[in-house]
């Protein structure tokens, strides 16, 4: 059987037009059974029997026979869509069999809340009673009240746009003054208008302040505001905050608002999910290149072993910046060439040593140790080079003329 025969049989059996029959068959890839089921879903059987013919339709004379036997000049008006009642289709509508297609009719019913009380039945044949299930969690009654109020006062985004100020698209008007007419009366001024959005002015008493927006999330184990922490339902203080919100008052510390400040609270229903703390980006602090690495001091812990660490300098050293006073161990010979070496100390201070080129690295270590005692090493920051406490290497041999050194604690 080709498609034309299937289309003809489908239209004759269901009393529909050829265009309608072709639509249903093409929608189901010319599957006769699926097309019939789809037709029953789109046009239920009770709609055809529930229609009452209007006065105009009742006046149309009934035509019997095939269309080839019709004669006359006037064209027959299109007959209303009719379909024979399918007894099998009514049997499927009883609810025993599942539908193959979901239509808009299935979505017309109101959404039932998952927390509605269930009705139970008890008793015998003649003493049956309908018992309403108790509240599983009476602490969440305030949450249900707030959600119900939020549902009743829901405003669509289109309504918010319509209720917004219409003055943004209007033009502002002002007055101008001709040059050289400062002493004339104000009535001689010429009005000037400018199209486009007006300039934003700070809010005044006549201009209402724009309300803040806060999002209130209700989770399975508590509630939260925006990305803030969770407040459990078991805490009596949190129950008091819910009572404030239910009465239309905003807790200042919870919503982060000031007194008499307008606020819009958006309620999000997440009762089927547990609260998960939002991801926070990494936060920390950096360390300057060449800064001191302080070894942590170990302490005695209960049940643990005591570890003794090397003693480090914990007493702050008062070092004046750019101090050029030499240490007593540095004997400066004014007749020999001298140089200045800047040392950045481990405690954040800085000192400047005046030495001869004949002084050794050991002399520099002793001078720095007198200012900032402890175990340390001296290094050149760039190019990176560590200086050993060597009494045989002079300042000139180490190329430390006008150099900058860094003290690093061990």
From Swiss-Prot:
| Sequence ranges of Low complexity compositional bias | 65-85, 163-174
Please name the Gene3D superfamilies in this protein's record. DNA helicase RuvA subunit, C-terminal domain, Phosphatidylinositol 3-kinase Catalytic Subunit, Chain A, domain 1, SEP domain
Where does this protein have compositionally biased stretches of type Polar residues? 86-97, 183-196
Provide the alphabetized UniProt keywords.
Answer: Meiosis, Phosphoprotein, Sporulation, Ubl conjugation pathway
Q: Which SMART domains match?
A: SEP, UBX
Residues modified as Phosphoserine are 156, 167, 186
- Lineage: superkingdom: Eukaryota
Question: What one GO molecular function would you report for this record?
Answer: ubiquitin binding
Against PROSITE patterns, the record matches this protein to: SEP, UBX
Q: Where is this region: Disordered?
A: 46-139, 154-212
Among the record's GO biological process terms, what is one? autophagosome assembly
Q: Per the database record, which ranges form the SEP domain?
A: 211-276
Q: Which residues form the UBX domain?
A: 334-410
Spell out which residues are annotated as carrying Phosphothreonine: 190
Pfam families per the UniProt record, alphabetical: SEP, UBX
UniProt-listed InterPro entries: NSFL1C_SEP_dom_sf, SEP_domain, UBA-like_sf, Ubiquitin-like_domsf, UBX_dom
**What GO cellular component entries does it have?**
cytosol; nucleus
Q: What is the annotated quaternary arrangement, including any partners?
A: Interacts with cdc48.
What is known about what this protein does?
Involved in CDC48-dependent protein degradation through the ubiquitin/proteasome pathway. Involved in delivery of substrates to the 26S proteasome. Also required for membrane fusion and sporulation.
Q: Which named protein is this?
A: UBX domain-containing protein 3
Instruction: Give me the gene this protein comes from.
Output: ubx3
